[in-house]
């Protein structure tokens, strides 16, 4: 397995008095600004999550480096008596509004406890910003207006984690990927299903999309173009030994063609991964407009060796490349962002990922040509 050279590598969050988990990354192209979010915890365990923190980075095109400002707490992203988890940033380019979605869970109630008792106490929350994350609105609890009575049909749920998606349709639809453990039968354990929260009015109101197949958990979505047709591609964690994917022809409302992606292996309990779409940089006959990039641990036994995978035929689950290594050793969750053209003329990406035994969250920049040079050699 080849190892990818990188343009920059820097630790943004390091475990000490507090632990940090669950990275989320957003690139604001016009501002040349990166926003790196994470959960700040009293310890590494989920039950000890506390707050969501942010570091702001300024990208310098001349040096191809990002200068990061100190950590700050997103103080508005707190529901009283609850811990804030699973940061999911989303930027509406049309209204220039930044949303930060997350879940709020009371006290030290664990996901396992909710699955065991089948009592859902998780809340869907959001804050927004009109100045690129410098100041934030008061918290909105969207649970009743968005989920309503369906909330009690779930044992628990979560969003993301990681970046969300604005579609290129006329409405500029906003999609927040999510999953819910549904209580389908009193005698059975709750089963996880991925789906999307959808807004057609720039975040004023939200609705539930329909579910992907069962055994789909933490997920991300990307918009892919196949000529004149657009599809929403969903890639989800599973317990099946490999990722699962599905596609939506109607902007995230319904998903179809659910497939296990055998080339994208999962460790025994699965792990979060990240996917982004980007414009095909090579003009070839019959080439698709959009390619996909995906990051995830490459070992089927453990969360180790972070790899990046390329798919030049996005809807074909067999078309994923072999991985190129981004980082050796223990790793876990990651989040990708497309940062436009890199210094070598190929697309450039930022990646924020968990390293070591959740000791660090590291940011790095690499280009497509660095990760997959043979794609360009074939031109």
From Swiss-Prot:
It is found in: Cytoplasm, Cytosol. Highly expressed in heart. Its main location: cytoplasm. The keyword Protease does not apply. InterPro entries: Sialidase, Sialidase_fam, Sialidase_sf. GO terms for biological process: ganglioside catabolic process; glycoprotein catabolic process; oligosaccharide catabolic process. Substrate binds at residues 21, 41, 179, 181, 218, 237, 303. The active site is at residues 46, 303, 333, 354. GO terms for cellular component: catalytic complex; cytosol; membrane. BNR repeats lie at residues 127-138, 197-208. It catalyses: Hydrolysis of alpha-(2->3)-, alpha-(2->6)-, alpha-(2->8)- glycosidic linkages of terminal sialic acid residues in oligosaccharides, glycoproteins, glycolipids, colominic acid and synthetic substrates; a ganglioside GD1a + H2O = a ganglioside GM1 + N-acetylneuraminate; a ganglioside GM1 + H2O = a ganglioside GA1 + N-acetylneuraminate; a ganglioside GT1b + H2O = a ganglioside GD1b + N-acetylneuraminate. SUPFAM superfamilies: Sialidases (SSF50939). GO terms for molecular function: exo-alpha-sialidase activity. Keywords: Carbohydrate metabolism, Cytoplasm, Glycosidase, Hydrolase, Lipid degradation, Lipid metabolism, Repeat. Exo-alpha-sialidase that catalyzes the hydrolytic cleavage of the terminal sialic acid (N-acetylneuraminic acid, Neu5Ac) of a glycan moiety in the catabolism of glycolipids, glycoproteins and oligosacharides. Recognizes sialyl linkage positions of the glycan moiety as well as the supramolecular organization of the sialoglycoconjugate. Displays preference for alpha-(2->3)-sialylated GD1a and GT1B gangliosides over alpha-(2->8)-sialylated GD1b, in both monomeric forms and micelles. Hydrolyzes exclusively monomeric GM1 ganglioside, but has no activity toward the miscellar form. Belongs to the glycosyl hydrolase 33 family. This is Sialidase-2. The gene is Neu2.
